[in-house]
Amino acid sequence: MGKEKQHVSIVVIGHVDSGKSTTTGHLIYKCGGIEKRAIEKFEKEAAEMGKGSFKYAWVLDKLKAERERGITIDIALWKFETEKYSFTIIDAPGHRDFIKNMITGTSQADLAILVIASPPGEFEAGISQNGQTREHALLAYTLGVKQMIVACNKMDDKNVNWSQDRYEEVSKEMDLYLKKVGYNPAKVPKVPTSGWTGENLFERTDKTHALGKWYKGPCLLEALDNCDPPKRPVDKPLRLPLQDVYKIGGIGTVPVGRVETGLIKPGMVVTFAPSGLSTEVKSVEMHHEALPQAGPGDNVGFNVKNVSVKDLKRGYVCGDSKNDPPKGCASFNAQVIILNHPGEIHAGYAPVLDCHTAHIACKFSELILKMDRRSGKKLEDTPKMIKSGDAAMVKMVASKPMCVEAFTQYPPLGRFAVRDMRQTVAVGVIKSVEKKEVEGKMTKSAAKK
């Protein structure tokens, strides 16, 4: 057994008919953990329903449907490997809660594959003012997905026919747009692909192929393998948002969550925000195994001394008492992008915020300024209202105690989705937090240390 490959999480984004599902399905099909038998079954069903041309998308739809019906699909199906990395596709659009998931991210994406349709008319629709290509690229950047690969898909379409001119035209347009969003276009590979034929997905196109005659760059899999290894924030102070709190007979209170930054280890004294309670960690476990320590990305349960289950809740944040412990907030300022709200938003609007594992109503107490959503330049001070498509700096006040952080310091605790009318109305990034000092309880074991 060699050294374990580094894990990289991918999110696949792009306009509705760009061929995302076919491309993703094909990737998983070729490199992933789907059993041959399951694929053959899907192929047969697709053919019977006259959907032969959708066979790879069909694979993905089947997986998604099962996932949405709550049948837990072996997550290995969504994994595939390259020479250097082990990739997991953590989400593909088409999921109802895609945007919310992308923000509160059960796991944060390290890399985005932006799939665009190359045929004339289709590409233009995706990149138009209200096209999803724009929306998704902007979201990915706003939410801190640092690396991107563009798949110029549907190159096999009869109106493209592997044309170098069309590829260059589309690439140039994408570069202009990605630069506006904030990416460095020179660092974003544009890979011509066909999700349907599989051309240039897994291996470089043959020189005799219409594409191979002019394209000499990497295939999609190589481009993925060439990505920079993600840096994990081990050296930051501990932040661990609680997903659940259990009471386990004979053991006691066990909070559960994912370490976002820093390390947690037995013997450490931790503080929970927003309540300010401090106690000692007795043990840390992952998959029923005791660990000497756990770091970013680890989903763990940890046992705490002399703390009742009633004292801790989902959405609380655990941190190291001696190293920048987390605190509740009185208010915070955030840059908010309104995605889809049917009316006008005024000061006093109070939707629900999903930030890390917290789900709390927050009031837009003050609209500070309206800004250009791409350049960040100020457009007007204290606007009367904001609406879909606007970006604004807003002062927010939570309806009950909550713990959030500035995005620059602790990214996973500094981005949020605004939910209203059962959809994601806006996304936000927290710029600054006004902390609230509380006299928290300290258990005996914490006081001793």
Swiss-Prot record:
Chief localisation class: cytoplasm
Binding site for GTP: 14-21, 91-95, 153-156
One Pfam family this sequence matches: GTP_EFTU_D2
A molecular function (GO) term: translation elongation factor activity
GO cellular component, one term: cytoplasm
Region spans: G4: 153-156
G1: annotated span: 14-21
Positions bearing N6-methyllysine: 265
Modification sites for N6,N6,N6-trimethyllysine: 79, 187, 310, 400
Compartments it resides in: Cytoplasm
PANTHER family: TRANSLATION FACTOR
Protein name (database record): Elongation factor 1-alpha
Source organism of this protein record: Pyropia yezoensis
